[in-house]
Amino acid sequence: MKITTVGVCIISGIFPLLILPQLPGTLTLAFLTLFACVLAFIPVKTVRYIALTLLFFVWGILSAKQILWAGETLTGATQDAIVEITATDGMTTHYGQITHLQGRRIFPASGLVMYGEYLPQAVCAGQQWSMKLKVRAVHGQLNDGGFDSQRYAIAQHQPLTGRFLQASVIEPNCSLRAQYLASLQTTLQPYPWNAVILGLGMGERLSVPKEIKNIMRDTGTAHLMAISGLHIAFAALLAAGLIRSGQIFLPGRWIHWQIPLIGGICCAAFYAWLTGMQPPALRTMVALATWGMLKLSGRQWSGWDVWICCLAAILLMDPVAILSQSLWLSAAAVAALIFWYQWFPCPEWQLPPVLRAVVSLIHLQLGITLLLMPVQIVIFHGISLTSFIANLLAIPLVTFITVPLILAAMVVHLSGPLILEQGLWFLADRSLALLFWGLKSLPEGWINIAECWQWLSFSPWFLLVVWRLNAWRTLPAMCVAGGLLMCWPLWQKPRPDEWQLYMLDVGQGLAMVIARNGKAILYDTGLAWPEGDSGQQLIIPWLHWHNLEPEGVILSHEHLDHRGGLDSILHIWPMLWIRSPLNWEHHQPCVRGEAWQWQGLRFSAHWPLQGSNDKGNNHSCVVKVDDGTNSILLTGDIEAPAEQKMLSRYWQQVQATLLQVPHHGSNTSSSLPLIQRVNGKVALASASRYNAWRLPSNKVKHRYQLQGYQWIDTPHQGQTTVNFSAQGWRISSLREQILPRWYHQWFGVPVDNG
């Protein structure tokens, strides 16, 4: 059996982890294992391939279950554990691994992230601490087109978050890497670009300023900050070159071609360890070791053979890496380059060496820019228009000047002399100053791409195949049909009789979108925190991804968990009208008696009263949206006293099909009279799973259910979509109907919401 065939079986067996709605049970896995063993004895190649694929499928499922074990069993109760610190910001965020539990060693260790508290003494990577832990299973917000933090955490082997109740250090010594890093940080303090140097050399990206990260994102050069293929492969190449040069001085019988290869891989492994062996670096080392073994075999391997074997080795070692977007981006980039150089090789023009190198670089960057576009849009929901020019400058500068200088300085830092080390750091710092001067000179190039353009992004692949096969002459009808299929989503227009309500999963806040005919109105804008807000992080990218143009905002009240994203949204769309009960400048009133039409929908305000001096929750703007058949009642954070006053007159006007649960499902709201007078079918609650107030309240939830409401909340369902049409209405949630995946489930204690 060929090794590439085994690689295909590995990839095929583990790939279902990406799409399974839930993991099979133990009995199912036992049956599949037994069935695969039976198939293996059938002397038919295809059947044996199927058996091997089934065994790798079982291996992938067992690996996923192993990661989820911690989240399913360690939550709820207090745990006595020994934690080895793997990374820290030196303040309140600590990454670690639980190596011992209740006095017993566990293998493999479970990843843990602790937030919000200082440890009793100075902390560094490599220390071991005895802790009394209160841990929680990872749970992330889930929105269509948003960052999937739950999937990311599982791919990073970090299924737990939590805090420590008690902590005492067992092993106070820092790891050799941490000591080396601390020494580098002290040495690099005088240099302006020290944070970027540490990011490039040691993979320490926590200290890189947000401004620099934004520049690299906008110019498509953020990939240079990851300690991955570029840095580690260059370290291997440099070490192999030095070893090969040293062989000149050895007797002929001691010279073997394998020695530089093995030495380069060993040096690359040491460098990967020195940088913290982060997942991209670990995957690169597995791929590099696989390539080395293929090279040592003495056979000729094609680019696709190596690609399959490397990807299979990575997935065999770490099956849940299939969830990692960075792995998919790297694998797609390599596949795109193999395809590019096979189907469109660089022209062999007779040019001087320097110009030939420039043409080769332009050819490479053109291929990666065009062919990687579909993956970039799927993962990042946008592209950088300046990435082509930016990478023409950044890749050669960083690859051939900055990184070699940093690697050399890191070596000299251990051996001296000091003056040589200072010179190397200075040159590396100045090369970065030149790089970012060039990047800052470029215009802001990042543009968000709507989902409807996704298929059209495959056009470079399609056109390249059509051109190379001369299909535009031999198969013109097929070429036209392919082009039309890629453009089809752009021609689809919203049905005029349909409109949608989206309840976004913004955590402990509220953000709802009413959409019709490509236009949108926001009811509240989520929350804000010191480093950002829901508008910038979620709502703006979400609107772009769904190709919706907002025309107005309704603010229920002034609390920050409801208006947190407003400033960011107004920065992008400054002409939006705003309605609120706040009497702020440029705000239109939202008080009882106000009514208006928008896209054929009738909006009517039912609270607060005109001239009311109330503030806070009971001053929330309550709005009813009606299409003549179905309606929704948006209530903000209104509480029971205001509910009673609102219902004292005109209570028939608040009847609605759907009700947004007031105040995130708090006991202070959702009085029985309100629930009965609205007489709705569905209750929609927005909250975070781990909130300090344990909302939504189980009493409130049962109160709605006893009155015949279907209960839906964002912790369980994620983003929820209600589609209204002439035929009625239909609800779908991202976590359960639209994108059901095993890694999106509610892990840990079933009733835990605090």
UniProtKB/Swiss-Prot annotation:
One of the GO biological process terms: establishment of competence for transformation
Residues spanning the membrane: 3-23, 24-44, 50-70, 223-243, 254-274, 320-340, 370-390, 392-412, 446-466, 471-491
Topology with respect to the bilayer: Multi-pass membrane protein
Entries under Gene3D superfamilies matching the protein: Ribonuclease Z/Hydroxyacylglutathione hydrolase-like (3.60.15.10)
The keyword Ribonucleoprotein is assigned to this record: no
Broad class of the protein's primary localization: membrane
SUPFAM superfamilies in UniProt: Metallo-hydrolase/oxidoreductase
Name of the protein in its database record: Uncharacterized protein YcaI
Biological source species: Escherichia coli (strain K12)
